[in-house]
């Protein structure tokens, strides 16, 4: 089967476009738009898609015909997910649970991949619902300790 270079390159190109667009969206305070970028990014990392606890393997290989179709009819570059495949079933399931909660702006893998963690951007009034959904639909069914960490962002790096 070999190394699937096409899907990895497409992921990288899409990530560059999403990074550029993400900065613009944050400056415009367009959090829903930024959240969609987080979802597209995770779709490029994912290996599985979950619905009601059931997993489906994601096949994001790109044939010549797929690439020609993307060029001719495809969505904008920021929506091209490619396939980096650095997620795992556990992170994919957590991401899908989080993204299904009303008030979750966008969730996806962050960190090293094949481990890492899921970061969810959530409206303040939906935090409790998201934590409960993750506990109820992921941690408890897998007999795992409940392990959500709620944080608030700051302005970022600055000179003190």
Describe each region flagged by the PLM.
Residues 111-118:
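Small/polar glycine-rich anion-binding or flexible loop at a beta-alpha turn
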